A protein has these predicted regions:
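Acidic, surface-exposed loops and disordered segments
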Residues: 1-174
Length: 174
């Protein structure tokens, strides 16, 4: 079977991570895969903020959990690295572009033997002044919409089995 298709079929959302940080090289490869995602008109409207700083990671988790309405929950399931995708609000394809970046990164993580999961609420986080200030501090100017968090780390335990694919989701016109 083709390696890319195999990765697509085998990748799962992971909800239990080891605390060990993935290597910088692995994270760089995952980010690079995200940067190669297709984008509308080749605009490359998405940016990635790679968070390996534990203090910031924990602050993001706290904010995300509050937005979720579960203040005592770790929405990143213990993953030590958080790759945040944001997209330029002025680009009409921003959400789609950012979504493809997320997909590429999750597939890349799987291909490197790491687990990942897409965690929402980045939109709400980056509407807050403290996270807009973080972007400004990083030199990211303009209006940005949070697309998602790609939580990445080593899987703690076994990856879940694939759910059965639902029927009646493909309609051929020949």
């Amino acid at each position: 079977m083709n390696e890319i298709i195999k990765a697509m079929e085998e990748r799962r959302s992971i909800r239990k991570f080891q605390p060990t940080m993935p290597t910088k090289d692995d994270l760089a490869q995952i980010v690079e895969a995200g940067l190669y995602a297709a984008s509308g008109m080749g605009r490359q409207s998405a940016v990635i903020v790679a968070v390996t700083n534990k203090e910031l990671r924990d602050q993001l988790a706290k904010t995300n959990a509050e937005i979720m309405g579960k203040p005592d929950f770790d929405p990143f399931y213990g993953a030590p690295a958080i790759l945040i995708v944001l997209a330029d609000k002025s680009c009409r394809t921003a959400i789609y572009d950012g979504s493809l970046v997320m997909g590429n990164m999750m597939l890349a993580a799987h291909s490197l033997g790491l687990g990942s999961i897409w965690i929402h609420r980045a939109k709400e986080e980056f509407e807050r002044p403290e996270y807009q200030a973080l972007l400004k501090k990083l030199g990211i100017e303009g209006e940005w919409e949070g697309i998602g968090h790609c939580a990445v780390g080593y899987i703690d335990g076994e990856a879940p089995k694939a759910a059965k694919r639902k029927d009646n989701r493909v309609f051929w016109i020949e």
